[in-house]
Each structure stands twice: as structure tokens, then as C-alpha cells.
Amino acid sequence: MARQALDLFDEGFQELTPSEFFRKNKQMLGFTGKIRSLTIVFHELITNSFDAAEEAGILPEIKIDLKRIGKDHYILRHQDNGPGIPEKYIPKVFCTMFAGSKFRNIQSRGQQGLGCSGCVLLSQMTTGKPVKVISGTMENGELKGVKMTLKMDVKKNQGLILEKEEVEVDGTGVCIELHFKDVSYSLSEQGAYEYIRRTMIANPHARIVFNDPTGNRYVFNRASDVIPPMPKEVLPHPWGVTADDLIFMAKHTDKRRFGSMLKSNLSRMSSMKIKELEELTGIDLNKRPKDMKWEEAEQIVEAFKKMKFMSPPTSGLIPIGEEQIDKGMKEILQPEFTATVTRKPKTYRGGIAFIVEAGIAYGGNSGRLVGDQRKAEIMRFANRVPLTFDAGSCAITEGVKSLDWKRYGIRDLENAPISIFVNVVSTNVPYLSTGKQSVSPEPEILGEIRQATMIVARKLHKYLRKKKAAKEEAQRAKIFESYVPVIIKQAALLAEREEPDYRELLDTVTRRAKLEILGGITE
């Protein structure tokens, strides 16, 4: 006898909390391999520490200890000097999925609200161990410290406090201790060390001390004392909204008229634009927002595309800046030559603002070390965050490799000792997947990546030409210095005269070459 639908649903229908969902789909958090999983953990903890410190006006300082206690089994201790986390928020920060301060339309290193809680979930899934947190905060001018031991209640998507006590702390900040299995530490291009190295190039205002499992201690010193200004929250641009966006705004606004709602919820909207919109659509924008129909919202979106607006405001975009990129590259790579550029803001998909920055470093420790040879490396970033995976599908890789590098004095890009830096800045970086490791090849973004890379490549080409000319001139100078004394001596003998004082003249002829050998390339 066939079973009834109600019986089937009563037995099998379930609801999943976000924690339960990601427990079954941890690959959606980026945890898809031993090396990658550990690198993602480093990424989440470091970016959270940076964001917290910068928002509080503090130069970030982080200490990381990674100890191996078994095969693919590690203890990670991460400590920062940020403002700390108030006691009542600690369980939410570390044990609740989709809880955080990164859900605004603002440029941010993280956007999903999964960072710390995702790391705790991975730790709990692979070891069953709780997370230990020490937080120091300033409350009413008094330094307070609290220590908690927590586990995540996956069913309820919330934290369970196993232990809690007040402790003395040296200053504000957070220290977190996590156990992980099925992860691996590697010095490869995708490993945790390389992630830190690249992070420091894009964040020269930070300092990180890293003690790795092999006993090595790496100190990445601060190259700048300038804290990046905080980006401002920006309103969506009319060219970038959808019918669903408008209906959502209408349901949650406190405005009494749809036109007023548009002016307060969208950038570049004025009374003149509202009047123009009414004329184009024939829709009465004085109606209540909740009375707006889907078909009318679609009409408005189509009308927006026909209207002229100023470009989106760029106050919400904070690039690293040419000087700071240069400082970062020089501190970490110690190159022979650097060039940087920050392009002017552009838009993609009609109304989403973005900025592309590029840098190039040649010689020194530039490039990736393969055996005893240095080869080219493309350092990809989005909002200062290194993208260490999925390079093949990324717009940055495509844009850089699409150049004819022979035109810029690089005959074999793969084997050149150069590091190419590209950072995409936006409130809404178009990632190709939830792993957020590659930028979508939007035509406008791809074009800007090419333009920025060409600018720094031309500067490198100019330097390489000067270097080649200097080398040739130095060789000519050596010939002069070797043969002029002999020629003058023989000429004096033939003429039966004393040798003239030729040294001042010889110095004048060879001075430029000597300067270039001793002091570098000069104009």
C-alpha cells in the first residue's frame, strides 16, 4: 500500500542550522585539502585580527605558534594586539555561523561571517577538542581579561561554555588555541608560510612573528607606521540593483514613499532623478513602498539602465597605495628594482566600483625559489588578501600572462627573477566560487589588470635597458683603462717625448661607467 505524503514528510523532513550545513559541506568553507585547510585557517585568523586592530586604530601585531604533535596533527596558538572581544560576544564570534560585523556594503577582507567559527568547526570535526580563548578588553578605563573554553553546538548553531574564569592579561587583544588534524604545514606556494609572506607585502603596517613546526622563527617586521583609513559604507548604485533588491528594500524601509526610499537607499539619486524615473516608467513613486509590485520593480531597473548617473562614489574604496606597496615589496623581497601603480576607480557590471593596483619587483629575493634558481611569481590579492589557490581560473593570472613580455625585456617570463603584484579593491569583489580564491574575468576588471601591469612592466623595461647600457659602457671603460696607458706609453716612445698626464681625461671618459658600477643606474 502506497504511503501518504504527510507520513513521508513527518518522518524525513528536516531543517539544518548553518553549522550543520557546513559540517556536511566543509569544502564550501575552503577546507578541501590538508595544505589548503591549514592555509585557510591562517587566512581567517589573520584577516580577523587585522580588521579588528585597524578599526580600533591600532597597528596590528600578531604572534603565531604552530606545533606538530603527531602525523597531520597540530596545535595552533594565535595572539593579536587588537581591542579584544567583550565577554558576552565571545561564544557568538567563535561558535555561531553567519554572525559578525562584515555584512555591510563596505570594503572588507572578509565578507561571509564564517571565519573564526569555521576554524572552530574544522577543529572540532577533526579532533573533538574545544577551543580555548583569552580576551583582554578595556571597559570603563579598566583592563579586563577573561578565559573561556568553548565547544560549538552544531544543532543550535551556538557556543557551549565549558569553562570560564577571569584572568590577568598584559594588554588588549585575543589569544585563541585550536587543535587540528588532517592538515599539513608546507613551504609550498600554497602553504601557510607563503600566505604570511604575501600578506606582509600588502600590509606593510603590520608585524607578524611566526614560529613554525620545524623550529624556525620568522619575524616579519613593520615597514610602515601608517594605519589604512577605514572605508566608508556606500549605498548601492542604481545601475547595479535588481528587481529583487528593490522589493527587499521596500519591505524593510521606514520611508512612507517609494521615491523617498530610493533617495535614501541608493547613491546618486536626487529629486530630479526621481522625476525623470516617473516620466520614463509612468509609475507613481509617491505610493507606499510595500505596494510596489514585482513588474513595477522590473520596469524601474530597466529605466535605470537608460538614465545617466554619476559614477558610484569611491569613498568606500581604500587602495593600499603606490608608496605602501613599494615599502612592502622592498621589506620582504629586498629587490634590485621596484615599480608600482594605483589606477583610478572604474566600474563593472554597470555600477560596482573597483580599483586595480599593480607592482613589480626585479632581482634580490623576487620570484619564487625553485632549487637554486628564482622564477617568476604572480602575487594575486583582493582587498589586501593573498589569493593562493585556483590561480589558473583567475582574472589576475589571465591578465598578467596575456601581455607580450618580450616587449618589456623579459624573454622568458616563467624563468625571470620577478614578482608581479596585483590587488583588486572593491566592496563587492566578483569571486568565481565560495572559496573566494580567484577573481572572475569581468571585461572591465581584466582590462584594468592589463593596463596596470603594462605600466609597471614599461618601467621595468626602461630599467633593464639602462642596466644593459650601463653594462656595455662599463665594458668599454675597462677596455679604455686597459689599453689607453699602453697606447700612450708607446706613442710617447715613438715621439721621443715624455708621457702626458692622461689620468684626468681617462677618469672623465670612464666616470659614468664607474658611477653606475658603484652606485647603481643614474640618469
UniProtKB/Swiss-Prot annotation:
GO molecular function: ATP binding; DNA binding; DNA topoisomerase type II (double strand cut, ATP-hydrolyzing) activity
Binding of ATP, residues: 48, 80, 101-102, 110-117, 436
Uppermost EC category: isomerase
EC numbers on record: 5.6.2.2
A Pfam family it matches: Topo-VIb_trans
Role description: Relaxes both positive and negative superturns and exhibits a strong decatenase activity.
DNA-binding is among the record's keywords: yes
Family membership noted in the UniProt record: Belongs to the TOP6B family.
Family annotation (CDD domains): HATPase_TopVIB-like (cd16933), TopoIIB_Trans (cd00823)
One GO-annotated biological process of the protein: DNA topological change
InterPro entries named in the record: HATPase_C_sf, Ribosomal_Su5_D2-typ_SF, Ribosomal_uS13-like_H2TH, Ribsml_uS5_D2-typ_fold_subgr, TopoVI_B, TopoVI_B_transducer
Gene giving rise to this polypeptide: top6B
Substrates-to-products reaction catalysed: ATP-dependent breakage, passage and rejoining of double-stranded DNA
Stored SMART domains: HATPase_c
Subunit: Homodimer. Heterotetramer of two Top6A and two Top6B chains.
Designated name of the protein: Type 2 DNA topoisomerase 6 subunit B
This protein's UniProt keywords: ATP-binding, DNA-binding, Isomerase, Nucleotide-binding, Topoisomerase
